[in-house]
């Protein structure tokens, strides 16, 4: 489901950032607008209200902001998924593909127990490489990935379709054309 109209207007577009040809979708304006931020979180949470969700996993960095708010609304725990080397305790790690190479992400090995119901959250899905890696990481430790939620989808880049092909339901609030 997409909530495009007034919520979409709260996202700033910056052309040619971080490089020429890219239309950067800046959610800091949505986050700064209390009503828009509240509505976005409420719309991400609504499908799971009343369902048992054990944890919300957020991808670095804007996924921490949105995921923390979603976890609070669902009375669930929050689990940060970070770039390698950023967590102080024993971690589980996975390599994942980026547009121009490979990177690694990790989470604390004891953050999620096998069988726990988890929602993955981030601000935007583009090619889906990072989200795909996060789903694989969560499944590697036995999580039941119930869904992945994003404020913005760039459907031309195929990320949401990639997650659906992994049997992960995807919820987005708005779409933008292009990169």
UniProtKB/Swiss-Prot annotation:
The family database entries (CDD domains) matched by this protein are listed as: PRTases_typeI
Instruction: Give, as in the UniProt entry, the pathway in which the protein acts.
Output: Purine metabolism; AMP biosynthesis via salvage pathway; AMP from adenine: step 1/1
Q: Which reaction does it catalyse?
A: AMP + diphosphate = 5-phospho-alpha-D-ribose 1-diphosphate + adenine
Question: Carries keyword Transferase?
Answer: yes
GO function term, MF aspect, one: AMP binding
Gene3D superfamilies to which the protein is assigned, alphabetical? 3.40.50.2020
Biological processes annotated in GO:
adenine salvage; AMP salvage; purine ribonucleoside salvage
What UniProt keywords are attached to this protein's entry? Cytoplasm, Glycosyltransferase, Purine salvage, Transferase
Name the GO cellular-component terms: cytoplasm
Extract the Pfam families matched here. Pribosyltran
UniProt subcellular location:
Cytoplasm
* Binding partners and assembly: Homodimer.
User: Which family does the entry's similarity section mention?
Assistant: Belongs to the purine/pyrimidine phosphoribosyltransferase family.
Known function: Catalyzes a salvage reaction resulting in the formation of AMP, that is energically less costly than de novo synthesis.
- Cite the PANTHER family for this sequence: ADENINE PHOSPHORIBOSYLTRANSFERASE
The entry's protein name is Adenine phosphoribosyltransferase
**From which organism does this entry originate?**
Bradyrhizobium diazoefficiens (strain JCM 10833 / BCRC 13528 / IAM 13628 / NBRC 14792 / USDA 110)
